[in-house]
Amino acid sequence: MPLDNKVQLNENGKEVNNNNNNDEDLKIQDNHNNKEPFFNRSELVRLLIQSLNSLGYDKSAEFLEKDSGISLQSKEINQFSECVVSGDWNKVEELLPFLKLNEFDTNNVKFLVYSQKFLEYLENHKIKEALECLRLEITPYTKDTSRLQVLTSLIMTSNSSETKKQIKQRSSRVNLLDDIRKYVNPNIMLPENRLEQLIKQSIQYQMGKCLYHNTSEQFINLFKDHTCDKSQMPLDVLFTLKDKHRDEIWFITFSHDGQRLASSSKDNTIIIWDMSTIYLDQPTEPKVMFILLGHTKEVSHLSWSPNDKYLLSASNDSTVKLWNTNDGTLLKTFTKHSDAVTCCGWHPDNKRFVSGGNDKNIYLWSIENLDLTNSNNNNNNHNNNNSNINGNSINGSNNNGNNNNNISPIKSWACARVNDLSIHKDGKQLIIICQEKKLRIYDLENEKTPEVVLMETDAITSMELSNDCNFALVNTSNQEIHLWDLEKQIIVQKYRGHKQGRFVIRSCFGGVDQAFVLSGSEDSTIYIWHRSSGILLETLSRHSGTVNTVCWSPCNPFIFCSASDDQTIKVWSRSNNHNSFINNLTNK
Protein backbone atom coordinates (compact mmCIF):
# COMPACT_ATOMS: atom_id res chain seq x y z
CA MET A 1 0.00 0.00 0.00
CA PRO A 2 1.50 3.41 -0.91
CA LEU A 3 2.22 5.78 1.96
CA ASP A 4 -0.19 8.44 0.77
CA ASN A 5 -3.23 6.18 1.08
CA LYS A 6 -5.47 6.90 4.06
CA VAL A 7 -5.32 4.30 6.83
CA GLN A 8 -8.24 3.90 9.20
CA LEU A 9 -8.20 2.44 12.69
CA ASN A 10 -11.02 0.28 14.01
CA GLU A 11 -12.52 0.58 17.48
CA ASN A 12 -9.68 -1.51 18.96
CA GLY A 13 -7.02 0.64 17.36
CA LYS A 14 -6.21 -1.95 14.70
CA GLU A 15 -5.58 -0.87 11.13
CA VAL A 16 -8.43 -1.29 8.64
CA ASN A 17 -7.13 -2.09 5.16
CA ASN A 18 -9.60 -1.47 2.34
CA ASN A 19 -7.28 -2.71 -0.43
CA ASN A 20 -7.34 -6.27 -1.71
CA ASN A 21 -3.60 -6.68 -2.26
CA ASN A 22 -1.48 -9.18 -0.34
CA ASP A 23 0.11 -6.54 1.89
CA GLU A 24 -2.73 -6.82 4.41
CA ASP A 25 -0.71 -5.78 7.44
CA LEU A 26 1.42 -3.13 5.76
CA LYS A 27 4.58 -4.96 6.76
CA ILE A 28 8.00 -3.65 5.77
CA GLN A 29 10.08 -5.94 3.57
CA ASP A 30 13.68 -6.71 4.45
CA ASN A 31 15.71 -5.65 1.41
CA HIS A 32 18.45 -8.17 2.15
CA ASN A 33 16.60 -11.45 2.50
CA ASN A 34 13.01 -10.46 1.66
CA LYS A 35 11.83 -11.68 5.07
CA GLU A 36 9.06 -9.91 6.89
CA PRO A 37 9.95 -8.31 10.23
CA PHE A 38 8.06 -8.98 13.41
CA PHE A 39 6.23 -5.67 13.52
CA ASN A 40 3.49 -3.81 11.70
CA ARG A 41 4.48 -0.82 9.58
CA SER A 42 1.63 1.35 10.77
CA GLU A 43 2.69 0.77 14.39
CA LEU A 44 6.19 1.96 13.55
CA VAL A 45 4.81 5.07 11.87
CA ARG A 46 2.66 5.81 14.92
CA LEU A 47 5.73 5.47 17.16
CA LEU A 48 7.64 7.87 14.92
CA ILE A 49 4.81 10.40 15.12
CA GLN A 50 4.74 10.10 18.90
CA SER A 51 8.52 10.51 19.13
CA LEU A 52 8.52 13.57 16.88
CA ASN A 53 5.89 15.16 19.10
CA SER A 54 7.83 14.38 22.28
CA LEU A 55 10.99 15.86 20.73
CA GLY A 56 9.12 19.06 19.90
CA TYR A 57 8.88 18.51 16.14
CA ASP A 58 5.12 18.98 16.02
CA LYS A 59 5.02 20.17 12.41
CA SER A 60 7.09 17.20 11.27
CA ALA A 61 4.77 14.86 13.17
CA GLU A 62 1.74 16.48 11.55
CA PHE A 63 3.34 16.17 8.10
CA LEU A 64 4.11 12.47 8.69
CA GLU A 65 0.50 11.85 9.69
CA LYS A 66 -0.73 13.49 6.48
CA ASP A 67 1.90 11.87 4.27
CA SER A 68 1.34 8.37 5.64
CA GLY A 69 -2.39 8.63 6.20
CA ILE A 70 -1.83 7.08 9.63
CA SER A 71 -3.05 8.82 12.77
CA LEU A 72 -1.28 8.56 16.09
CA GLN A 73 -4.57 8.05 17.91
CA SER A 74 -8.24 8.61 17.18
CA LYS A 75 -9.54 12.14 17.64
CA GLU A 76 -11.65 10.97 20.60
CA ILE A 77 -8.57 9.60 22.39
CA ASN A 78 -6.66 12.81 21.70
CA GLN A 79 -9.59 14.78 23.08
CA PHE A 80 -9.76 12.49 26.12
CA SER A 81 -6.08 13.10 26.89
CA GLU A 82 -6.49 16.85 26.50
CA CYS A 83 -9.48 16.86 28.84
CA VAL A 84 -7.58 14.91 31.51
CA VAL A 85 -4.70 17.37 31.40
CA SER A 86 -7.04 20.39 31.42
CA GLY A 87 -9.24 18.95 34.18
CA ASP A 88 -12.49 18.88 32.21
CA TRP A 89 -13.89 15.99 34.27
CA ASN A 90 -17.38 15.97 32.76
CA LYS A 91 -15.95 15.63 29.27
CA VAL A 92 -13.53 12.95 30.49
CA GLU A 93 -16.46 10.87 31.74
CA GLU A 94 -18.30 11.42 28.47
CA LEU A 95 -15.34 10.12 26.44
CA LEU A 96 -14.63 7.08 28.63
CA PRO A 97 -16.49 4.64 26.30
CA PHE A 98 -13.90 5.30 23.59
CA LEU A 99 -11.28 3.59 25.77
CA LYS A 100 -13.13 0.28 25.16
CA LEU A 101 -12.68 -0.95 28.74
CA ASN A 102 -14.51 -3.75 30.48
CA GLU A 103 -16.69 -2.90 33.47
CA PHE A 104 -14.02 -3.66 36.06
CA ASP A 105 -11.36 -1.50 34.40
CA THR A 106 -13.91 1.25 33.73
CA ASN A 107 -14.65 1.44 37.45
CA ASN A 108 -10.93 1.58 38.26
CA VAL A 109 -10.41 4.43 35.81
CA LYS A 110 -13.40 6.29 37.21
CA PHE A 111 -11.96 5.87 40.68
CA LEU A 112 -8.67 7.39 39.49
CA VAL A 113 -10.40 10.31 37.77
CA TYR A 114 -12.67 11.12 40.71
CA SER A 115 -9.76 10.78 43.15
CA GLN A 116 -7.87 13.37 41.13
CA LYS A 117 -10.92 15.62 41.22
CA PHE A 118 -11.16 15.07 45.00
CA LEU A 119 -7.49 15.96 45.57
CA GLU A 120 -7.81 19.15 43.58
CA TYR A 121 -10.80 20.17 45.68
CA LEU A 122 -8.68 19.66 48.81
CA GLU A 123 -5.76 21.54 47.32
CA ASN A 124 -8.09 24.50 46.67
CA HIS A 125 -9.59 24.19 50.19
CA LYS A 126 -13.04 23.20 48.87
CA ILE A 127 -13.80 20.76 51.67
CA LYS A 128 -17.56 20.57 51.02
CA GLU A 129 -17.08 19.71 47.35
CA ALA A 130 -14.39 17.18 48.29
CA LEU A 131 -16.77 15.44 50.71
CA GLU A 132 -19.52 15.26 48.07
CA CYS A 133 -17.06 13.89 45.52
CA LEU A 134 -15.90 11.24 47.99
CA ARG A 135 -19.44 10.19 48.93
CA LEU A 136 -21.22 10.36 45.56
CA GLU A 137 -18.53 9.72 42.96
CA ILE A 138 -15.59 7.85 44.48
CA THR A 139 -17.26 5.45 46.92
CA PRO A 140 -19.53 3.72 44.35
CA TYR A 141 -16.54 2.69 42.25
CA THR A 142 -14.38 0.85 44.76
CA LYS A 143 -14.86 -1.89 47.31
CA ASP A 144 -11.40 -1.37 48.73
CA THR A 145 -12.07 0.31 52.07
CA SER A 146 -8.36 0.98 52.65
CA ARG A 147 -8.24 3.27 49.60
CA LEU A 148 -11.26 5.17 50.89
CA GLN A 149 -9.70 5.45 54.34
CA VAL A 150 -6.58 7.03 52.87
CA LEU A 151 -8.65 9.69 51.08
CA THR A 152 -10.81 10.29 54.16
CA SER A 153 -7.72 10.79 56.32
CA LEU A 154 -6.56 13.52 53.94
CA ILE A 155 -9.76 15.46 54.67
CA MET A 156 -9.31 15.12 58.42
CA THR A 157 -5.74 16.45 58.30
CA SER A 158 -5.96 18.67 55.23
CA ASN A 159 -4.51 21.69 57.03
CA SER A 160 -1.27 20.00 58.12
CA SER A 161 1.86 20.79 56.13
CA GLU A 162 2.60 17.10 55.60
CA THR A 163 -0.87 16.44 54.20
CA LYS A 164 -0.62 19.45 51.92
CA LYS A 165 2.65 18.06 50.64
CA GLN A 166 1.05 14.65 50.01
CA ILE A 167 -1.91 16.23 48.21
CA LYS A 168 0.38 18.22 45.97
CA GLN A 169 2.44 15.12 45.13
CA ARG A 170 -0.64 13.01 44.39
CA SER A 171 -2.60 15.57 42.42
CA SER A 172 -0.75 15.44 39.10
CA ARG A 173 -2.91 15.23 35.97
CA VAL A 174 0.04 13.99 33.93
CA ASN A 175 0.52 11.13 36.40
CA LEU A 176 -3.22 10.45 36.21
CA LEU A 177 -3.00 10.06 32.44
CA ASP A 178 -0.09 7.63 32.86
CA ASP A 179 -2.12 5.60 35.37
CA ILE A 180 -5.11 5.47 33.00
CA ARG A 181 -2.90 4.20 30.16
CA LYS A 182 -2.19 1.07 32.20
CA TYR A 183 -5.81 -0.02 31.77
CA VAL A 184 -6.16 0.82 28.08
CA ASN A 185 -5.25 -1.36 25.10
CA PRO A 186 -1.94 0.13 23.83
CA ASN A 187 -3.29 0.02 20.27
CA ILE A 188 -5.90 2.55 21.35
CA MET A 189 -3.76 4.74 23.62
CA LEU A 190 -0.02 4.47 23.06
CA PRO A 191 2.22 4.11 26.12
CA GLU A 192 4.19 7.28 26.76
CA ASN A 193 7.58 7.50 24.99
CA ARG A 194 7.16 4.00 23.61
CA LEU A 195 9.94 4.18 20.99
CA GLU A 196 12.37 5.48 23.60
CA GLN A 197 11.38 2.58 25.87
CA LEU A 198 12.09 0.09 23.09
CA ILE A 199 15.50 1.63 22.43
CA LYS A 200 16.36 1.51 26.14
CA GLN A 201 15.31 -2.13 26.31
CA SER A 202 17.50 -2.92 23.32
CA ILE A 203 20.49 -1.18 24.89
CA GLN A 204 19.93 -2.93 28.22
CA TYR A 205 19.72 -6.27 26.44
CA GLN A 206 22.99 -5.62 24.60
CA MET A 207 24.67 -4.54 27.83
CA GLY A 208 23.41 -7.67 29.55
CA LYS A 209 24.92 -9.80 26.79
CA CYS A 210 28.20 -7.84 26.80
CA LEU A 211 30.52 -10.07 28.83
CA TYR A 212 33.03 -7.34 29.65
CA HIS A 213 30.63 -4.44 30.15
CA ASN A 214 32.26 -2.26 32.79
CA THR A 215 31.70 1.33 31.73
CA SER A 216 29.84 4.22 33.28
CA GLU A 217 29.27 6.03 29.98
CA GLN A 218 25.99 7.93 30.05
CA PHE A 219 25.38 7.84 26.30
CA ILE A 220 25.46 4.83 24.01
CA ASN A 221 26.07 5.08 20.26
CA LEU A 222 22.82 4.09 18.55
CA PHE A 223 24.57 3.55 15.22
CA LYS A 224 26.32 0.34 16.27
CA ASP A 225 25.76 -2.62 18.56
CA HIS A 226 27.22 -2.23 22.04
CA THR A 227 30.33 -4.26 22.91
CA CYS A 228 33.16 -3.85 25.42
CA ASP A 229 36.64 -5.35 25.38
CA LYS A 230 38.91 -6.30 28.26
CA SER A 231 40.45 -2.84 28.49
CA GLN A 232 37.85 -1.78 31.06
CA MET A 233 38.59 -4.73 33.35
CA PRO A 234 41.02 -4.59 36.31
CA LEU A 235 43.32 -7.42 35.23
CA ASP A 236 46.75 -6.04 36.18
CA VAL A 237 48.40 -5.67 39.58
CA LEU A 238 48.83 -2.01 40.43
CA PHE A 239 50.42 -2.46 43.88
CA THR A 240 51.43 -5.31 46.16
CA LEU A 241 51.10 -4.52 49.87
CA LYS A 242 53.53 -6.69 51.83
CA ASP A 243 55.73 -6.93 54.92
CA LYS A 244 53.01 -5.62 57.24
CA HIS A 245 51.02 -8.72 58.11
CA ARG A 246 53.27 -11.56 59.28
CA ASP A 247 50.96 -14.48 58.55
CA GLU A 248 48.05 -15.48 56.32
CA ILE A 249 45.61 -12.66 55.52
CA TRP A 250 42.06 -13.92 56.04
CA PHE A 251 39.81 -10.95 55.43
CA ILE A 252 39.78 -7.57 53.66
CA THR A 253 36.98 -5.04 53.25
CA PHE A 254 36.69 -1.53 51.83
CA SER A 255 35.05 1.25 53.80
CA HIS A 256 31.74 2.32 52.25
CA ASP A 257 33.33 5.42 50.70
CA GLY A 258 36.15 3.32 49.25
CA GLN A 259 38.85 5.51 50.78
CA ARG A 260 40.14 2.95 53.31
CA LEU A 261 40.73 -0.78 53.43
CA ALA A 262 40.75 -2.95 56.55
CA SER A 263 42.62 -6.26 56.60
CA SER A 264 42.87 -8.97 59.26
CA SER A 265 45.26 -11.83 59.66
CA LYS A 266 46.18 -15.07 61.32
CA ASP A 267 48.85 -12.95 63.09
CA ASN A 268 46.04 -11.52 65.34
CA THR A 269 46.34 -8.01 63.88
CA ILE A 270 44.14 -5.63 61.92
CA ILE A 271 45.50 -2.99 59.56
CA ILE A 272 43.64 0.04 58.21
CA TRP A 273 45.09 1.27 54.92
CA ASP A 274 44.72 4.67 53.25
CA MET A 275 43.44 3.83 49.76
CA SER A 276 42.69 7.37 48.59
CA THR A 277 45.91 7.57 46.58
CA ILE A 278 45.04 4.67 44.26
CA TYR A 279 42.28 6.70 42.59
CA LEU A 280 44.59 9.53 41.49
CA ASP A 281 45.59 10.09 37.87
CA GLN A 282 49.07 9.09 39.01
CA PRO A 283 48.29 6.52 41.72
CA THR A 284 50.68 5.88 44.59
CA GLU A 285 50.97 2.90 46.89
CA PRO A 286 48.53 2.81 49.84
CA LYS A 287 50.03 3.56 53.26
CA VAL A 288 49.25 2.07 56.65
CA MET A 289 47.07 4.33 58.77
CA PHE A 290 46.73 2.13 61.88
CA ILE A 291 47.77 -1.30 63.07
CA LEU A 292 45.20 -2.45 65.61
CA LEU A 293 46.47 -4.75 68.35
CA GLY A 294 44.37 -6.36 71.05
CA HIS A 295 43.12 -9.73 69.88
CA THR A 296 44.95 -12.75 71.26
CA LYS A 297 44.04 -15.11 68.42
CA GLU A 298 43.34 -14.98 64.70
CA VAL A 299 40.99 -12.26 63.40
CA SER A 300 38.54 -13.87 60.99
CA HIS A 301 36.02 -11.15 60.10
CA LEU A 302 35.68 -7.34 59.89
CA SER A 303 32.76 -4.98 59.35
CA TRP A 304 32.68 -1.20 58.79
CA SER A 305 29.75 0.70 60.26
CA PRO A 306 27.52 2.28 57.57
CA ASN A 307 28.95 5.72 58.40
CA ASP A 308 32.53 4.32 58.45
CA LYS A 309 33.16 5.72 61.96
CA TYR A 310 33.58 2.30 63.55
CA LEU A 311 35.11 -1.06 62.70
CA LEU A 312 34.09 -4.38 64.22
CA SER A 313 36.53 -7.28 64.44
CA ALA A 314 35.58 -10.90 65.17
CA SER A 315 38.26 -13.22 66.48
CA ASN A 316 39.00 -16.80 67.42
CA ASP A 317 39.68 -15.45 70.93
CA SER A 318 35.84 -15.46 71.41
CA THR A 319 35.55 -11.67 71.39
CA VAL A 320 34.22 -8.90 69.19
CA LYS A 321 36.05 -5.59 69.39
CA LEU A 322 34.78 -2.13 68.44
CA TRP A 323 37.37 0.30 67.07
CA ASN A 324 37.36 4.02 66.32
CA THR A 325 38.49 4.27 62.70
CA ASN A 326 39.51 7.92 62.97
CA ASP A 327 42.29 7.33 65.49
CA GLY A 328 42.55 3.55 65.74
CA THR A 329 41.58 3.33 69.40
CA LEU A 330 39.81 0.38 70.96
CA LEU A 331 36.40 1.43 72.27
CA LYS A 332 34.75 -1.74 73.56
CA THR A 333 35.21 -5.50 73.78
CA PHE A 334 32.18 -7.79 73.72
CA THR A 335 32.75 -11.11 75.49
CA LYS A 336 29.46 -13.03 75.48
CA HIS A 337 30.58 -15.71 73.00
CA SER A 338 32.16 -18.86 74.44
CA ASP A 339 33.96 -19.99 71.28
CA ALA A 340 35.50 -18.46 68.17
CA VAL A 341 33.50 -15.56 66.71
CA THR A 342 33.32 -16.15 62.97
CA CYS A 343 31.36 -13.14 61.67
CA CYS A 344 29.83 -9.77 62.49
CA GLY A 345 27.71 -7.21 60.68
CA TRP A 346 26.15 -3.79 61.24
CA HIS A 347 22.54 -2.70 61.28
CA PRO A 348 21.96 0.28 58.92
CA ASP A 349 21.11 2.51 61.92
CA ASN A 350 24.82 2.58 62.98
CA LYS A 351 23.70 1.73 66.52
CA ARG A 352 23.31 -2.05 66.44
CA PHE A 353 25.27 -5.00 65.15
CA VAL A 354 25.14 -8.78 65.16
CA SER A 355 27.79 -11.40 65.81
CA GLY A 356 27.83 -15.16 65.28
CA GLY A 357 30.22 -17.92 66.19
CA ASN A 358 31.13 -21.51 66.74
CA ASP A 359 29.26 -21.52 70.06
CA LYS A 360 26.06 -21.82 67.98
CA ASN A 361 24.80 -18.41 69.07
CA ILE A 362 23.92 -15.18 67.29
CA TYR A 363 23.82 -12.01 69.35
CA LEU A 364 22.29 -8.62 68.58
CA TRP A 365 24.15 -5.80 70.32
CA SER A 366 23.51 -2.09 70.80
CA ILE A 367 26.13 0.62 71.28
CA GLU A 368 23.58 3.41 71.63
CA ASN A 369 23.87 3.80 75.41
CA LEU A 370 27.50 2.81 75.77
CA ASP A 371 30.27 5.17 76.75
CA LEU A 372 32.33 5.20 73.57
CA THR A 373 34.99 7.53 74.82
CA ASN A 374 38.41 5.93 74.85
CA SER A 375 37.86 2.93 77.13
CA ASN A 376 41.55 2.10 77.24
CA ASN A 377 43.83 4.50 79.05
CA ASN A 378 46.88 2.94 77.41
CA ASN A 379 45.79 3.49 73.81
CA ASN A 380 47.47 6.83 73.37
CA ASN A 381 50.69 5.85 75.13
CA HIS A 382 51.80 3.41 72.38
CA ASN A 383 53.05 0.94 74.95
CA ASN A 384 51.80 -2.65 75.46
CA ASN A 385 54.77 -3.84 73.35
CA ASN A 386 53.53 -1.91 70.30
CA SER A 387 56.10 -0.49 67.92
CA ASN A 388 55.93 2.17 65.24
CA ILE A 389 56.42 0.59 61.80
CA ASN A 390 57.74 2.87 59.04
CA GLY A 391 56.47 5.92 60.90
CA ASN A 392 52.84 4.79 60.80
CA SER A 393 50.77 5.34 63.89
CA ILE A 394 49.83 2.13 65.69
CA ASN A 395 46.95 2.05 68.15
CA GLY A 396 45.45 -0.75 70.14
CA SER A 397 45.58 -2.62 73.39
CA ASN A 398 45.43 -6.04 74.89
CA ASN A 399 43.06 -4.76 77.55
CA ASN A 400 39.34 -5.24 77.23
CA GLY A 401 38.46 -1.69 78.28
CA ASN A 402 36.47 -0.53 81.28
CA ASN A 403 33.34 -2.48 82.24
CA ASN A 404 33.30 -4.39 78.97
CA ASN A 405 32.32 -7.59 80.73
CA ASN A 406 29.04 -6.00 81.79
CA ILE A 407 27.81 -5.50 78.23
CA SER A 408 24.93 -7.80 77.39
CA PRO A 409 23.30 -8.46 74.02
CA ILE A 410 19.77 -7.17 73.50
CA LYS A 411 18.68 -10.30 71.67
CA SER A 412 19.96 -13.76 70.80
CA TRP A 413 19.22 -16.73 68.54
CA ALA A 414 20.37 -20.33 68.87
CA CYS A 415 21.32 -22.29 65.76
CA ALA A 416 24.10 -24.45 64.36
CA ARG A 417 27.63 -23.09 64.09
CA VAL A 418 27.46 -19.77 62.28
CA ASN A 419 29.74 -19.30 59.26
CA ASP A 420 28.59 -15.89 58.00
CA LEU A 421 25.82 -13.34 58.35
CA SER A 422 24.53 -10.01 57.08
CA ILE A 423 21.69 -7.59 57.79
CA HIS A 424 19.46 -6.41 54.93
CA LYS A 425 19.94 -2.74 54.06
CA ASP A 426 16.38 -1.99 55.24
CA GLY A 427 17.29 -3.33 58.68
CA LYS A 428 14.35 -5.72 58.76
CA GLN A 429 15.99 -9.06 57.98
CA LEU A 430 18.98 -10.98 59.27
CA ILE A 431 20.46 -13.49 56.82
CA ILE A 432 22.80 -16.15 58.20
CA ILE A 433 24.53 -19.29 56.95
CA CYS A 434 25.30 -22.20 59.26
CA GLN A 435 27.20 -25.45 59.05
CA GLU A 436 23.88 -27.26 58.63
CA LYS A 437 23.81 -26.41 54.86
CA LYS A 438 21.09 -23.79 55.23
CA LEU A 439 20.51 -20.10 54.66
CA ARG A 440 18.26 -18.75 57.38
CA ILE A 441 16.40 -15.45 57.21
CA TYR A 442 15.09 -13.95 60.46
CA ASP A 443 12.67 -11.06 60.85
CA LEU A 444 14.34 -8.51 63.15
CA GLU A 445 11.17 -6.50 63.70
CA ASN A 446 8.59 -9.21 64.33
CA GLU A 447 9.56 -12.26 66.36
CA LYS A 448 6.31 -13.99 65.40
CA THR A 449 7.23 -14.08 61.73
CA PRO A 450 8.52 -17.59 60.98
CA GLU A 451 12.08 -17.81 59.73
CA VAL A 452 12.73 -18.56 56.06
CA VAL A 453 15.00 -21.53 55.41
CA LEU A 454 16.78 -22.06 52.07
CA MET A 455 18.38 -25.47 51.66
CA GLU A 456 21.75 -26.18 50.07
CA THR A 457 23.14 -29.63 49.26
CA ASP A 458 26.66 -28.95 50.55
CA ALA A 459 28.30 -27.01 53.35
CA ILE A 460 28.23 -23.21 52.94
CA THR A 461 31.38 -21.38 53.98
CA SER A 462 30.75 -17.71 53.22
CA MET A 463 28.14 -15.27 51.93
CA GLU A 464 28.02 -11.87 50.25
CA LEU A 465 24.87 -9.78 49.66
CA SER A 466 24.37 -7.67 46.54
CA ASN A 467 24.01 -3.91 46.96
CA ASP A 468 20.22 -4.14 46.67
CA CYS A 469 20.21 -7.11 49.10
CA ASN A 470 18.00 -9.09 46.72
CA PHE A 471 20.74 -11.62 45.93
CA ALA A 472 23.26 -13.61 47.93
CA LEU A 473 26.50 -15.21 46.75
CA VAL A 474 27.33 -18.32 48.76
CA ASN A 475 30.54 -20.32 48.50
CA THR A 476 30.00 -24.04 48.95
CA SER A 477 32.40 -26.84 49.81
CA ASN A 478 31.74 -28.66 46.52
CA GLN A 479 33.71 -26.00 44.59
CA GLU A 480 30.67 -24.04 43.42
CA ILE A 481 29.43 -20.52 44.11
CA HIS A 482 25.66 -20.16 44.05
CA LEU A 483 23.71 -16.99 43.33
CA TRP A 484 20.47 -17.00 45.32
CA ASP A 485 17.49 -14.80 44.51
CA LEU A 486 16.32 -14.14 48.06
CA GLU A 487 12.88 -12.89 47.00
CA LYS A 488 12.09 -15.85 44.76
CA GLN A 489 14.07 -18.18 47.06
CA ILE A 490 15.79 -19.99 44.20
CA ILE A 491 19.32 -20.42 42.86
CA VAL A 492 19.53 -18.42 39.63
CA GLN A 493 23.16 -19.05 38.66
CA LYS A 494 26.15 -21.22 39.54
CA TYR A 495 29.84 -20.42 39.10
CA ARG A 496 32.45 -23.15 38.69
CA GLY A 497 36.17 -23.48 38.07
CA HIS A 498 37.78 -22.32 41.31
CA LYS A 499 39.22 -24.69 43.91
CA GLN A 500 37.72 -24.87 47.39
CA GLY A 501 37.59 -27.81 49.76
CA ARG A 502 39.75 -27.23 52.80
CA PHE A 503 39.55 -23.51 53.58
CA VAL A 504 37.09 -20.64 53.80
CA ILE A 505 37.12 -18.85 50.45
CA ARG A 506 35.20 -15.60 49.99
CA SER A 507 33.64 -14.16 46.84
CA CYS A 508 32.08 -10.80 45.97
CA PHE A 509 30.13 -8.84 43.37
CA GLY A 510 31.89 -6.12 41.40
CA GLY A 511 32.04 -3.75 38.47
CA VAL A 512 29.41 -1.39 37.10
CA ASP A 513 25.97 -2.56 38.28
CA GLN A 514 27.77 -5.47 40.00
CA ALA A 515 27.93 -7.30 36.68
CA PHE A 516 30.77 -9.60 37.74
CA VAL A 517 31.41 -12.26 40.36
CA LEU A 518 34.92 -12.47 41.79
CA SER A 519 36.39 -15.20 43.98
CA GLY A 520 39.62 -16.40 45.50
CA SER A 521 40.73 -20.00 45.26
CA GLU A 522 42.95 -22.59 46.89
CA ASP A 523 45.07 -22.81 43.70
CA SER A 524 46.46 -19.27 44.30
CA THR A 525 44.26 -17.89 41.51
CA ILE A 526 41.52 -15.27 41.24
CA TYR A 527 38.46 -16.13 39.15
CA ILE A 528 36.13 -13.65 37.43
CA TRP A 529 32.73 -14.66 36.02
CA HIS A 530 30.03 -12.81 34.12
CA ARG A 531 27.29 -12.60 36.70
CA SER A 532 24.16 -13.15 34.62
CA SER A 533 25.48 -15.87 32.29
CA GLY A 534 27.87 -17.64 34.65
CA ILE A 535 30.60 -17.64 31.98
CA LEU A 536 34.15 -17.74 33.36
CA LEU A 537 35.91 -14.68 31.93
CA GLU A 538 39.36 -14.52 33.50
CA THR A 539 41.78 -16.33 35.82
CA LEU A 540 44.50 -14.22 37.44
CA SER A 541 47.54 -15.99 38.89
CA ARG A 542 49.76 -13.51 40.71
CA HIS A 543 49.58 -14.83 44.28
CA SER A 544 51.81 -17.63 45.60
CA GLY A 545 49.35 -18.98 48.16
CA THR A 546 45.64 -19.59 48.65
CA VAL A 547 43.62 -16.47 47.81
CA ASN A 548 41.27 -16.26 50.79
CA THR A 549 39.26 -13.15 50.06
CA VAL A 550 38.56 -10.49 47.45
CA CYS A 551 36.69 -7.18 47.53
CA TRP A 552 35.78 -4.68 44.79
CA SER A 553 36.05 -0.95 45.35
CA PRO A 554 32.61 0.57 46.05
CA CYS A 555 33.55 3.87 44.41
CA ASN A 556 35.54 2.76 41.36
CA PRO A 557 34.60 -0.15 39.07
CA PHE A 558 38.20 -0.47 37.86
CA ILE A 559 39.72 -1.40 41.23
CA PHE A 560 39.60 -4.52 43.38
CA CYS A 561 41.83 -6.08 46.04
CA SER A 562 42.79 -9.65 46.89
CA ALA A 563 44.42 -11.16 49.98
CA SER A 564 46.30 -14.40 50.33
CA ASP A 565 48.13 -16.88 52.51
CA ASP A 566 51.29 -15.42 50.93
CA GLN A 567 50.84 -12.51 53.41
CA THR A 568 50.22 -9.94 50.67
CA ILE A 569 47.35 -7.78 49.49
CA LYS A 570 47.27 -7.01 45.78
CA VAL A 571 45.55 -3.97 44.31
CA TRP A 572 44.26 -4.65 40.80
CA SER A 573 43.43 -2.10 38.10
CA ARG A 574 43.15 -1.63 34.35
CA SER A 575 46.30 -2.06 32.29
CA ASN A 576 46.21 1.55 31.09
CA ASN A 577 46.28 2.77 34.71
CA HIS A 578 43.51 5.28 34.03
CA ASN A 579 42.33 5.05 37.60
CA SER A 580 40.72 8.45 37.93
CA PHE A 581 37.01 7.98 38.17
CA ILE A 582 34.16 10.18 39.36
CA ASN A 583 33.75 9.01 42.95
CA ASN A 584 30.07 9.74 43.05
CA LEU A 585 28.69 6.30 42.28
CA THR A 586 25.69 5.71 44.52
CA ASN A 587 26.29 2.87 47.02
CA LYS A 588 23.32 0.50 46.57
From Swiss-Prot:
Domain (LisH): residue spans on this chain: 40-72
Positions of WD repeats: 244-283, 294-333, 336-375, 413-452, 455-494, 499-539, 542-582
Limits of the CTLH domain: 73-129
Entry keyword annotation includes Translocase: no
Family annotation (InterPro entries): CTLH_C, G-protein_beta_WD-40_rep, LisH, TPR1-like_2nd, WD40/YVTN_repeat-like_dom_sf, WD40_repeat_CS, WD40_repeat_dom_sf, WD40_rpt
Region annotation Disordered: where it falls in the sequence: 1-32, 376-403
GO cellular component: GID complex
UniProt-listed GO biological process terms: proteasome-mediated ubiquitin-dependent protein catabolic process
Source species, domain of life: Eukaryota
Any single Pfam family the record assigns to this protein: LisH_WDR26
Keywords, comma-separated and alphabetical: Repeat, WD repeat
Protein name as it appears in the record: WD repeat-containing protein DDB_G0349043
Phylogenetic placement of the source organism: Eukaryota, Amoebozoa, Evosea, Eumycetozoa, Dictyostelia
